């Protein structure tokens, strides 16, 4: 099995399923995590080209997770429905995408960050 190139961290099940489908239909290999604890475990076990993290998680902070992923060499995208409340400096460290997002907007950002799926193999 090919190693996943994207880690998607989203606590809301419907949003997670939709985003995962958009990414896999576009040819990306995706791992998912619904909590910060699961995300940390996945980050310890594998390297990802891109980590997409929801900012507000029930057990942690998606920005903190994105910071850790970036320190390991991953590109990062923070998604949030609370753009005006993001901590100062977040946009200088991570790409930001407002929720809800259109599939084509998500894919445009992902392609800009890591290229197409064939570019990752």
Place the predicted regions along the sequence by residue.
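Active-site residues of response regulator receiver
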Residues: 54
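Conserved acidic carboxylate
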Residues: 10
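Acidic, metal-coordinating helix/loop segments flanking the phosphotransfer/catalytic sites
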Residues: 7, 32-50
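The feature encodes the CheY-like receiver
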Residues: 58
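Two-component/phosphorelay signaling modules centered on CheY-like receiver
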Residues: 13-31
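C-terminal output helix
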Residues: 101-121
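Hydrophobic/aromatic residues positioned on beta-strands within the core alpha/beta folds
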Residues: 79-80
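Acidic catalytic/metal-coordinating carboxylates
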Residues: 35, 61-64
């Amino acid at each position: 099995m090919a190693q996943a190139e994207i880690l998607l961290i989203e606590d809301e099940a419907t949003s997670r399923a939709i985003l995962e489908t958009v990414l896999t239909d576009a040819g990306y290999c995706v791992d998912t995590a619904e909590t910060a604890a699961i995300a940390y475990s996945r980050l310890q076990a594998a390297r990802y080209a891109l980590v997409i993290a929801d900012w507000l998680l029930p057990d942690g902070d998606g920005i903190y997770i994105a910071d850790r992923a970036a320190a390991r060499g991953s590109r990062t995208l923070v998604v949030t429905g609370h753009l005006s409340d993001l901590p100062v400096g977040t946009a200088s460290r991570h790409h930001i995408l407002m929720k809800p997002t259109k599939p084509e907007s998500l894919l445009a950002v992902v392609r800009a960050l890591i290229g197409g799926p064939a570019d990752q193999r």
